[in-house]
Amino acid sequence: MVGKSKNRAHKNIRARSCLRCRRRKVKCDRQYPCSRCKESEESCTYGVNEQAVQLLEEPLSRPITRETDSSAHQETRTRLEENNLPKTQKFGFVDWKTILKSSAEFQGIVQRDPESRLREALETDPKLKKRLECILETIPPWDVCESLLKVYANTFNVTNYILDFEQADKLLSDLKNSNHVFATSIILIVTAIAVALSLESFPSNIERYFSAVNHSAIELSDALNSKIDDFLNEEVIFRLWRNIDRIRLHAIRAQLCMRNQFRSMNTDLCYAIHYACFVNPIFQNTDTEYEANMEVWLSICEIDALECVLRSCQPWVQHDIYGKLLSQRKMGSDVISYEFHSLLGQLLTCGLEIYKAIHTSTVNEFVNSIQFYESQLSLVLMEIESKFSNIDGSDIHFRYLFLKTVFWTVRKNLYQGFITVSRTLVPNYPDIVQKLGQTSIQLSRLISNSMDCFEKYGWLKAMLILVTHTFLIIHVCSERGYDVPKDFWNVTASVQATLEEKKYPGIVWERIHYVLNIYTTINSVEPELSEDHGDLDDQNLFQVFTDIFDFNFNFPLPNL
């Protein structure tokens, strides 16, 4: 017997007759009152709900005047409208503050907005005024600040757009001319200046300034950040400071942490995501600042996804949320920036999907999905080449190189997981090793040939770490049958020369330098280590790699 189809066609819901016509089983014209009830001068009621029946009967149960008739119909209409409200209405974002605010509005109490209360606190509290003045006294001269702000915009806004340079430059000019600038804007501008001070290269006027004073750019950056934190941790400021401004501040700092810090957690990214998701979900706002907030949220998602793709860190933001929000990015007047972020979003979404699939699929399931991801990535690469390869401009050239670096990194991540499992479990294991080796070679050559460009835009340290890890992948592939090109080790020599030139302090960079020494003489006896490398002479290649890349953040939420 054939079962009934579950997908039944929905019947058209017909208007029902009034209650009296239904009882009498006669035809009803379904008006109010219907013709039959009107003719018999009886009350006409419809059984939509009992409350509506009572409301409709009430005016007919007492003498009707013009006043009572109009008021009764108005009351009936109002109460019926209330009953017809959608039953699927959802709560908004509810916390203690919104509950108190709603209660106050119900009682007729007019509450002042946090910005006016913050303004009053800054004007009346001498301690807060002094802290803010101390921050302004610490910044460099105005011409140096203007140059640093331009350095920030030229370096960071090319990749992640968080702070509007033209608006920030105007506010800095107002500060210079002693015009009033609100504290939130001052703190964001000074934060951007502090981040710019942490970069490696500066224009000549900034270099001259620091050669004439008794502190370095890094020391000044640390001092500014410390004073900003002290100011924001004041109880009144912490309570009244707008969450969107706090999110912007941590997002600005997170950009720098992503590029310069390797073995420590990006706590500013953690703060920004925590505030954006839990304290004040900016992607749910529908006010006039929605578009600006959405741009900040998308930039935070990009930073989070870049850390996952470039460093194989567990992402904070779920990849499907980021993918859904990408379509809400506005094109605006800068078409090149829109195209860049659109292509970057496609690459990062694919990279996040690969990361999730590696950790949730079986080996065979993931092998079967490789061709799908390869075709996705190939389509994105074709778009990158068509839209960025033949356009002049240093910013555009950097974006082209950056997109290709992310592309080859995502492709490397697609294959590199297979070197952790037995070759007997993987169909076509030699082919996968071959693809992994070729992809890693392409990525290494690209980074090696683009060192100057990456340094100009503040990405050199991150790329040096990435290429060092890629060298390890190539070495493993060579042990499993991949023939490394004879001229490839010139690439390692080029990277090693860059490290020797920069002389970055710290044990991590010393160990990376040691690894590169081994790479450049991979077919010869292990070279003797210089005195600068101390206790590294008794450690083999993989022990050193363990020291460099063995870290675990465990993703704790910071104390808020």
UniProtKB/Swiss-Prot annotation:
Pfam families xrefs: Zn_clus (PF00172)
Bilayer disposition of the protein: Single-pass membrane protein
Intracellular or extracellular location(s): Nucleus membrane
Name of the molecule in the record: Uncharacterized transcriptional regulatory protein C16G5.17
Lineage summary: Eukaryota, Fungi, Dikarya, Ascomycota, Taphrinomycotina
Main location: nucleus
SUPFAM superfamilies per record: Zn2/Cys6 DNA-binding domain (SSF57701)
GO cellular component, one term: nuclear membrane
Protein keywords: DNA-binding, Membrane, Metal-binding, Nucleus, Transcription, Transcription regulation, Transmembrane, Transmembrane helix, Zinc
Top-level taxon of the source organism: Eukaryota
Molecular function terms, GO-annotated: DNA-binding transcription factor activity, RNA polymerase II-specific; RNA polymerase II cis-regulatory region sequence-specific DNA binding; zinc ion binding
Bias (Basic and acidic residues) ranges: 64-80
DNA-binding residue intervals: 18-44
Gene Ontology biological process terms from the UniProt entry: regulation of transcription by RNA polymerase II
Disordered: annotated segments: 60-80
InterPro entries membership: Sec_Metabolite_Reg, Zn2-C6_fun-type_DNA-bd_sf, Zn2Cys6_DnaBD
Segments crossing the lipid bilayer: 182-202
Keyword Secreted assigned: no
